[in-house]
Amino acid sequence: MRLIGMPKEKYDPPDPRRIYTIMSAEEVANGKKSHWAELEISGRVRSLSTSLWSLTHLTALHLNDNYLSRIPPDIAKLHNLVYLDLSSNKLRSLPAELGNMVSLRELLLNNNLLRVLPYELGRLFQLQTLGLKGNPLSQDILNLYQDPDGTRKLLNFMLDNLAVHPEQLPPRPWITLKERDQILPSASFTVMCYNVLCDKYATRQLYGYCPSWALNWEYRKKGIMEEIVNCDADIISLQEVETEQYFTLFLPALKERGYDGFFSPKSRAKIMSEQERKHVDGCAIFFKTEKFTLVQKHTVEFNQVAMANSDGSEAMLNRVMTKDNIGVAVVLEVHKELFGAGMKPIHAADKQLLIVANAHMHWDPEYSDVKLIQTMMFVSEVKNILEKASSRPGSPTADPNSIPLVLCADLNSLPDSGVVEYLSNGGVADNHKDFKELRYNECLMNFSCNGKNGSSEGRITHGFQLKSAYENNLMPYTNYTFDFKGVIDYIFYSKTHMNVLGVLGPLDPQWLVENNITGCPHPHIPSDHFSLLTQLELHPPLLPLVNGVHLPNRR
């Protein structure tokens, strides 16, 4: 997921000439509701009522020109405050909890008795104005503050030097959904899907709440590799893998652990210099060679597919073709040993193939049409790959559905989107709202399983029967930033061939709250995405005799 920018949306400070009105008795009697988002307390006040901290609707609080000598930690309960004026008081210190008020855009502390500032103020990444004049602060602090863009430099300095508690992440729970079949032959394997957050996207402009040292790739890559190694999946699908890091980090490290891999960068790499090309991100698939053998590998460039299927559609040319996202797919042969002793397919000569597809769709929420069409293009291309693979010598039949599919992706789309509806339900209406009423109808039929001349009844369909491994809100979010928290990463599988035995559950949300983690990356969490991990059970297409009868496929 890419964020447009952080956190510089327009901020309008309170109007100093603000006026108020008192409702009449008649207005009160008629049920008129009062609305006041600002509060001013003045008159040489020395202490504040604890009831003030219950006014959580406040967005502006004026406490200036009083005799306050301390501010209690409970002020952090006013989590909607964007403006706080504590100027011209007698404050000698500030509570560390002030750093939890991450909605603040303006914090005025002028003309107090402050000698030190809590480094927790560095967490106020949305702060645009920090007033510190007239305080006996150390020269080091003042030097930073008085620089051009001093507020930002000072906040960055405090965040980068804020002590991080050494406690480790609590383990994510394994959720068992089904026991493995003990009667019918089956193979079991695990699949990981993980957006590792490419280095060039990990900037303070996008992730201002994360210390710069914890955004640094040299730091983050250790946590990312630790996550991958600890999951120990049989198949790994990664998004946002930088080209250079694939060849210098991921492939060598995983080859040592018995994997082979396939990678393709985004299409822009083709028109770049060799030096620039190193930093283009793309998608990678790794698999354990003791369990799978590579049969085919494919790259799907969405802009090329869009160009070939535009049929004169301006929207297709101007909106879809201009995005250089890609997908990759591999056809694997599943080793017979995975089916266990005495649990092999009926014909020993048969090869059990498996296709694994991995993609990263366009990020912008305003381009729901592009995401949906990219998904359709990818599924259509995977269908072509399957048709070719299914006609290979030794494969069971020419039917694409005879080869099971695992599709991993950062779809940048929520569970209620047209993208997920299309994948889960086998199709989507050609006038779905996600198409934004743009003129795609003719070219969309190129991606329907019925073909351009088939009967689609107003739907764009695909021939796969797919199901998400993470159903029923097993994960409340897969992408966790300050501005956005939601499910946008998925593992789909062929439900005619496979069952889900279990999935890796979510990180304890209470731990995130207790540690004031409002977004990732974080010193303990190296990406803005959480990994997905599932265990799948694969049944071969030809089942053995049970009591003299061939059992039908049960799904």
UniProtKB/Swiss-Prot annotation:
Organ and tissue specificity: Highly expressed in placenta, skeletal muscle, pancreas, testis and leukocytes. Weakly expressed in heart, spleen and thymus.
PROSITE patterns on file: LRR (PS51450)
Principal location: cytoplasm
Entry's Gene Ontology cellular component terms: CCR4-NOT complex; cytoplasm; cytosol; nucleus
Subcellular location: Cytoplasm; Nucleus
Catalytic activity annotation: Exonucleolytic cleavage of poly(A) to 5'-AMP
Regulation: Inhibited by free AMP, and with lesser efficiency also by CMP, GMP, UMP, ATP and neomycin.
UniProt: substrate binding residues: 240, 276, 360, 365, 412, 479, 484
SUPFAM superfamilies per record: DNase I-like, L domain-like
Region of interest (Nuclease domain), residue spans: 158-555
Binding residue positions for Mg(2+) 1: 240
Known EC number: 3.1.13.4
Region of interest (Required for interaction with CNOT1, CNOT3 and CNOT7), residue spans: 1-152
Record's subunit section: Component of the CCR4-NOT complex; distinct complexes seem to exist that differ in the participation of probably mutually exclusive catalytic subunits; the complex contains two deadenylase subunits, CNOT6 or CNOT6L, and CNOT7 or CNOT8. Interacts with CNOT1, CNOT3, CNOT7, CNOT8 and CNOT9. Interacts with TOB1. Interacts with NANOS2. Interacts with ZFP36. Interacts with ZFP36L2. Interacts with RBM46.
Family from the record: Belongs to the CCR4/nocturin family.
Record's function text: Has 3'-5' poly(A) exoribonuclease activity for synthetic poly(A) RNA substrate. Catalytic component of the CCR4-NOT complex which is one of the major cellular mRNA deadenylases and is linked to various cellular processes including bulk mRNA degradation, miRNA-mediated repression, translational repression during translational initiation and general transcription regulation. Additional complex functions may be a consequence of its influence on mRNA expression. May be involved in the deadenylation-dependent degradation of mRNAs through the 3'-UTR AU-rich element-mediated mechanism.
Descriptive protein name: CCR4-NOT transcription complex subunit 6-like
Organism listed in the record: Homo sapiens (Human)
